[in-house]
Amino acid sequence: MVRIALDPTPYNNTVHLLDFPDLVARLGYEYLQLTPNPDFGRHFHYPKVDSDMIAKLKKRAKHAGVTITSVLPVQRFGGPEEHHVQAAIFNTTRYIQIAAELGAPVVNTEFSGRPEREEESEFAFYRAMEALIPVLEREGVQLNFDPHPDDFVEDGLEAWRIIRGLNTDQVGFVYVGSHTFHLGDRASTLLPEIGDRLGAVYTADTFDHHRSNGLRYITNPPGNAVRVHQHLNIGDGDVNWTELFGTLKRTGYLDRDDALIVSNVFAEDENADESSRFQLAKIKELIAAA
Protein backbone atom coordinates (compact mmCIF):
# COMPACT_ATOMS: atom_id res chain seq x y z
CA MET A 1 0.00 0.00 0.00
CA VAL A 2 1.38 3.37 -1.01
CA ARG A 3 1.60 5.91 1.79
CA ILE A 4 1.03 9.49 0.62
CA ALA A 5 2.55 12.01 3.03
CA LEU A 6 2.55 15.79 3.17
CA ASP A 7 5.66 17.92 3.58
CA PRO A 8 4.28 20.80 5.70
CA THR A 9 7.02 23.32 4.85
CA PRO A 10 4.52 25.92 3.50
CA TYR A 11 2.98 26.10 6.97
CA ASN A 12 6.17 26.60 8.98
CA ASN A 13 5.43 30.27 9.71
CA THR A 14 1.75 29.82 10.56
CA VAL A 15 1.31 26.42 12.22
CA HIS A 16 3.06 25.10 15.33
CA LEU A 17 4.91 21.80 15.08
CA LEU A 18 2.49 20.09 17.47
CA ASP A 19 -0.44 21.16 15.29
CA PHE A 20 0.93 19.56 12.11
CA PRO A 21 -0.93 16.25 12.61
CA ASP A 22 -4.28 18.03 12.88
CA LEU A 23 -3.37 20.12 9.83
CA VAL A 24 -2.55 17.20 7.56
CA ALA A 25 -5.63 15.30 8.74
CA ARG A 26 -7.81 18.30 7.89
CA LEU A 27 -6.27 18.34 4.41
CA GLY A 28 -7.15 14.67 3.89
CA TYR A 29 -3.73 13.10 4.47
CA GLU A 30 -3.05 10.13 6.72
CA TYR A 31 0.73 10.51 6.68
CA LEU A 32 3.20 13.26 7.59
CA GLN A 33 6.90 13.75 6.87
CA LEU A 34 8.59 16.08 9.36
CA THR A 35 10.86 18.57 7.61
CA PRO A 36 13.10 21.47 8.74
CA ASN A 37 11.10 23.66 11.10
CA PRO A 38 12.08 26.16 13.82
CA ASP A 39 10.69 23.91 16.57
CA PHE A 40 11.93 20.65 15.08
CA GLY A 41 15.32 21.67 13.72
CA ARG A 42 16.72 24.01 11.07
CA HIS A 43 19.06 23.28 8.17
CA PHE A 44 22.55 22.27 9.35
CA HIS A 45 21.61 22.64 13.04
CA TYR A 46 21.10 20.27 15.94
CA PRO A 47 17.45 19.18 16.42
CA LYS A 48 15.50 21.21 18.96
CA VAL A 49 12.90 18.70 20.17
CA ASP A 50 13.21 16.92 23.49
CA SER A 51 11.56 13.71 24.68
CA ASP A 52 8.63 15.61 26.16
CA MET A 53 7.84 17.31 22.84
CA ILE A 54 8.30 14.02 20.98
CA ALA A 55 5.78 12.36 23.32
CA LYS A 56 3.32 15.21 22.80
CA LEU A 57 3.75 15.04 19.02
CA LYS A 58 3.15 11.28 19.00
CA LYS A 59 0.02 11.75 21.12
CA ARG A 60 -1.31 14.47 18.80
CA ALA A 61 -0.61 12.31 15.75
CA LYS A 62 -2.43 9.33 17.26
CA HIS A 63 -5.40 11.51 18.19
CA ALA A 64 -5.55 12.91 14.63
CA GLY A 65 -5.26 9.47 13.04
CA VAL A 66 -2.01 10.48 11.34
CA THR A 67 1.17 8.43 11.04
CA ILE A 68 4.54 10.18 11.01
CA THR A 69 6.43 8.28 8.32
CA SER A 70 9.82 9.96 8.29
CA VAL A 71 11.95 12.94 9.19
CA LEU A 72 13.98 15.17 6.86
CA PRO A 73 17.01 16.97 8.27
CA VAL A 74 19.49 18.74 5.98
CA GLN A 75 23.12 18.34 7.06
CA ARG A 76 26.50 18.76 5.36
CA PHE A 77 27.36 15.07 4.94
CA GLY A 78 29.57 15.98 2.00
CA GLY A 79 31.48 18.59 4.00
CA PRO A 80 33.84 19.30 2.50
CA GLU A 81 35.35 21.01 5.55
CA GLU A 82 36.13 18.80 8.54
CA HIS A 83 33.91 20.75 10.92
CA HIS A 84 31.00 20.32 8.49
CA VAL A 85 31.46 16.55 8.58
CA GLN A 86 31.71 16.40 12.35
CA ALA A 87 28.60 18.56 12.77
CA ALA A 88 26.68 16.38 10.30
CA ILE A 89 27.61 13.23 12.21
CA PHE A 90 26.81 14.77 15.60
CA ASN A 91 23.49 16.30 14.53
CA THR A 92 22.30 13.35 12.46
CA THR A 93 23.01 10.88 15.25
CA ARG A 94 20.40 12.72 17.29
CA TYR A 95 17.97 12.89 14.34
CA ILE A 96 18.26 9.12 13.94
CA GLN A 97 17.46 8.66 17.62
CA ILE A 98 14.46 10.98 17.26
CA ALA A 99 13.18 9.04 14.25
CA ALA A 100 13.37 5.82 16.25
CA GLU A 101 11.65 7.44 19.24
CA LEU A 102 8.87 8.75 16.99
CA GLY A 103 8.33 5.29 15.52
CA ALA A 104 9.15 6.81 12.12
CA PRO A 105 12.27 4.81 11.23
CA VAL A 106 13.14 6.65 8.01
CA VAL A 107 15.42 9.67 7.63
CA ASN A 108 15.35 11.31 4.20
CA THR A 109 18.02 13.88 3.42
CA GLU A 110 20.48 15.34 0.88
CA PHE A 111 24.17 14.81 0.09
CA SER A 112 25.23 18.50 0.40
CA GLY A 113 28.95 19.12 -0.20
CA ARG A 114 30.23 21.29 -3.04
CA PRO A 115 30.17 20.38 -6.75
CA GLU A 116 33.38 22.32 -7.42
CA ARG A 117 35.08 20.20 -4.72
CA GLU A 118 33.51 16.90 -5.72
CA GLU A 119 36.45 14.64 -4.82
CA GLU A 120 36.87 16.09 -1.33
CA SER A 121 33.11 16.07 -0.76
CA GLU A 122 32.72 12.44 -1.76
CA PHE A 123 35.47 11.46 0.68
CA ALA A 124 33.77 13.51 3.40
CA PHE A 125 30.47 11.77 2.66
CA TYR A 126 31.95 8.29 3.00
CA ARG A 127 33.67 9.26 6.25
CA ALA A 128 30.37 10.57 7.64
CA MET A 129 28.60 7.37 6.64
CA GLU A 130 31.30 5.24 8.24
CA ALA A 131 30.32 6.84 11.54
CA LEU A 132 26.55 6.86 10.98
CA ILE A 133 25.86 3.39 9.57
CA PRO A 134 26.45 1.71 12.96
CA VAL A 135 23.98 4.19 14.50
CA LEU A 136 21.40 3.36 11.82
CA GLU A 137 21.85 -0.35 12.45
CA ARG A 138 21.58 0.06 16.21
CA GLU A 139 18.42 2.19 16.02
CA GLY A 140 16.78 0.27 13.15
CA VAL A 141 16.50 3.37 10.96
CA GLN A 142 16.81 3.73 7.17
CA LEU A 143 18.71 6.74 5.73
CA ASN A 144 17.88 7.83 2.16
CA PHE A 145 19.68 10.43 0.04
CA ASP A 146 18.47 12.89 -2.59
CA PRO A 147 21.12 14.30 -4.97
CA HIS A 148 19.91 17.88 -4.64
CA PRO A 149 20.83 20.56 -7.19
CA ASP A 150 24.15 22.10 -6.11
CA ASP A 151 25.17 19.08 -4.03
CA PHE A 152 28.54 17.51 -4.78
CA VAL A 153 26.66 14.92 -6.83
CA GLU A 154 23.60 15.97 -8.84
CA ASP A 155 23.31 13.27 -11.49
CA GLY A 156 20.94 10.51 -10.42
CA LEU A 157 22.96 7.59 -11.73
CA GLU A 158 26.21 8.78 -10.17
CA ALA A 159 24.38 9.37 -6.87
CA TRP A 160 23.12 5.79 -6.95
CA ARG A 161 26.67 4.55 -7.58
CA ILE A 162 27.88 6.46 -4.52
CA ILE A 163 25.10 4.97 -2.37
CA ARG A 164 25.79 1.50 -3.74
CA GLY A 165 29.44 1.90 -2.77
CA LEU A 166 28.44 2.04 0.90
CA ASN A 167 27.67 -1.69 0.67
CA THR A 168 24.73 -1.57 3.08
CA ASP A 169 20.96 -1.89 2.72
CA GLN A 170 20.60 0.65 5.53
CA VAL A 171 21.05 3.53 3.05
CA GLY A 172 18.83 4.18 0.02
CA PHE A 173 17.80 6.72 -2.61
CA VAL A 174 15.18 9.49 -2.68
CA TYR A 175 13.79 10.28 -6.14
CA VAL A 176 12.63 13.91 -6.23
CA GLY A 177 10.34 14.85 -9.10
CA SER A 178 11.24 18.53 -8.96
CA HIS A 179 14.92 17.61 -9.46
CA THR A 180 14.17 15.56 -12.59
CA PHE A 181 16.15 17.70 -15.02
CA HIS A 182 19.19 17.90 -12.74
CA LEU A 183 19.07 14.14 -12.12
CA GLY A 184 19.35 13.49 -15.86
CA ASP A 185 15.64 13.00 -16.70
CA ARG A 186 16.09 9.23 -16.77
CA ALA A 187 13.47 7.78 -14.40
CA SER A 188 12.65 4.93 -16.79
CA THR A 189 16.22 3.59 -16.66
CA LEU A 190 17.42 4.86 -13.27
CA LEU A 191 14.63 3.53 -11.06
CA PRO A 192 14.92 -0.08 -12.29
CA GLU A 193 18.63 0.05 -11.47
CA ILE A 194 17.98 1.39 -7.96
CA GLY A 195 15.34 -1.30 -7.42
CA ASP A 196 14.42 -2.03 -3.81
CA ARG A 197 16.83 0.62 -2.58
CA LEU A 198 14.36 3.35 -3.57
CA GLY A 199 13.30 4.72 -0.21
CA ALA A 200 10.96 7.60 -1.10
CA VAL A 201 9.55 9.61 -4.01
CA TYR A 202 8.76 13.33 -3.77
CA THR A 203 6.11 14.83 -6.03
CA ALA A 204 6.29 18.45 -7.13
CA ASP A 205 6.66 19.70 -10.69
CA THR A 206 9.41 21.78 -12.28
CA PHE A 207 10.41 23.30 -15.61
CA ASP A 208 13.11 21.83 -17.83
CA HIS A 209 15.92 24.38 -17.61
CA HIS A 210 17.68 22.77 -20.59
CA ARG A 211 14.98 23.82 -23.06
CA SER A 212 15.23 26.74 -25.46
CA ASN A 213 18.95 26.13 -25.93
CA GLY A 214 19.50 26.64 -22.22
CA LEU A 215 18.01 30.13 -22.35
CA ARG A 216 14.78 29.38 -20.54
CA TYR A 217 16.31 30.93 -17.42
CA ILE A 218 18.81 33.75 -17.76
CA THR A 219 21.07 34.88 -14.94
CA ASN A 220 23.56 37.71 -15.13
CA PRO A 221 26.42 37.76 -15.61
CA PRO A 222 26.20 34.82 -18.06
CA GLY A 223 27.86 31.64 -16.91
CA ASN A 224 26.93 31.97 -13.24
CA ALA A 225 27.28 28.66 -11.39
CA VAL A 226 23.62 28.62 -10.36
CA ARG A 227 20.96 25.90 -10.21
CA VAL A 228 17.32 26.59 -11.05
CA HIS A 229 14.32 24.43 -10.21
CA GLN A 230 10.81 24.79 -8.82
CA HIS A 231 8.40 22.93 -6.54
CA LEU A 232 5.11 23.39 -8.41
CA ASN A 233 1.78 21.61 -8.40
CA ILE A 234 1.82 18.45 -10.51
CA GLY A 235 1.01 19.43 -14.10
CA ASP A 236 2.32 22.98 -13.87
CA GLY A 237 5.81 22.02 -15.13
CA ASP A 238 7.52 19.68 -17.57
CA VAL A 239 7.95 16.43 -15.60
CA ASN A 240 6.49 13.38 -17.36
CA TRP A 241 4.41 12.07 -14.48
CA THR A 242 2.80 9.31 -16.51
CA GLU A 243 6.25 7.91 -17.28
CA LEU A 244 7.42 8.28 -13.67
CA PHE A 245 4.44 6.51 -12.12
CA GLY A 246 4.42 3.90 -14.87
CA THR A 247 8.03 3.15 -13.99
CA LEU A 248 7.22 3.02 -10.28
CA LYS A 249 4.50 0.48 -11.08
CA ARG A 250 6.71 -1.57 -13.39
CA THR A 251 9.52 -1.78 -10.83
CA GLY A 252 7.10 -2.87 -8.10
CA TYR A 253 7.49 0.23 -5.94
CA LEU A 254 3.78 1.02 -5.90
CA ASP A 255 3.07 -2.49 -4.61
CA ARG A 256 5.47 -2.26 -1.67
CA ASP A 257 4.03 -1.98 1.84
CA ASP A 258 6.65 0.63 2.71
CA ALA A 259 6.23 2.75 -0.44
CA LEU A 260 6.31 6.45 0.45
CA ILE A 261 5.27 9.30 -1.83
CA VAL A 262 5.61 12.81 -0.41
CA SER A 263 3.90 15.93 -1.75
CA ASN A 264 6.40 18.79 -1.43
CA VAL A 265 5.05 21.86 -3.22
CA PHE A 266 6.77 25.06 -2.07
CA ALA A 267 5.55 27.54 -4.70
CA GLU A 268 1.94 27.90 -3.52
CA ASP A 269 2.13 29.09 0.09
CA GLU A 270 -0.73 31.54 -0.46
CA ASN A 271 -2.87 28.61 -1.69
CA ALA A 272 -1.32 25.90 0.48
CA ASP A 273 -4.58 24.21 1.49
CA GLU A 274 -5.90 24.04 -2.08
CA SER A 275 -2.51 22.92 -3.37
CA SER A 276 -2.19 20.17 -0.76
CA ARG A 277 -5.66 18.80 -1.50
CA PHE A 278 -5.01 18.95 -5.25
CA GLN A 279 -1.73 17.09 -4.84
CA LEU A 280 -3.33 14.31 -2.82
CA ALA A 281 -6.05 13.78 -5.41
CA LYS A 282 -3.58 13.93 -8.30
CA ILE A 283 -1.16 11.45 -6.72
CA LYS A 284 -4.02 9.00 -6.14
CA GLU A 285 -5.08 9.47 -9.76
CA LEU A 286 -1.56 8.78 -11.04
CA ILE A 287 -1.27 5.66 -8.88
CA ALA A 288 -4.60 4.33 -10.12
CA ALA A 289 -3.66 4.97 -13.75
CA ALA A 290 -0.17 3.43 -13.52
Which residues are covered by each model-predicted region?
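Active-site-proximal loop/turn and secondary-structure-junction residues that shape catalytic pockets
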Residues: 10-12, 36-38, 74-77, 111-115, ...
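Conserved, mostly hydrophobic/aromatic
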Residues: 24, 32, 61, 99, ...
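C-terminal helical cap(s) of enzyme catalytic domains, especially alpha/beta-barrels
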Residues: 272-290
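Active-site acidic/histidine proton-transfer and metal-coordination neighborhood
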Residues: 18, 59-64, 77-173, 274, ...
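Glycine-rich, proline-tolerant flexible connector loops at the mouths of alpha/beta enzymes
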Residues: 33-58, 112-117
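A short, acidic, flexible beta-alpha connecting loop/helix-capping segment that sits on the rim
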Residues: 11, 259-274
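Acidic/histidine-rich catalytic cores of soluble enzymes
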Residues: 2-9, 32, 130-232, 238, ...
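Acidic (Asp/Glu)-rich catalytic clusters
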Residues: 21-26, 48-69, 93-103, 130-138, ...
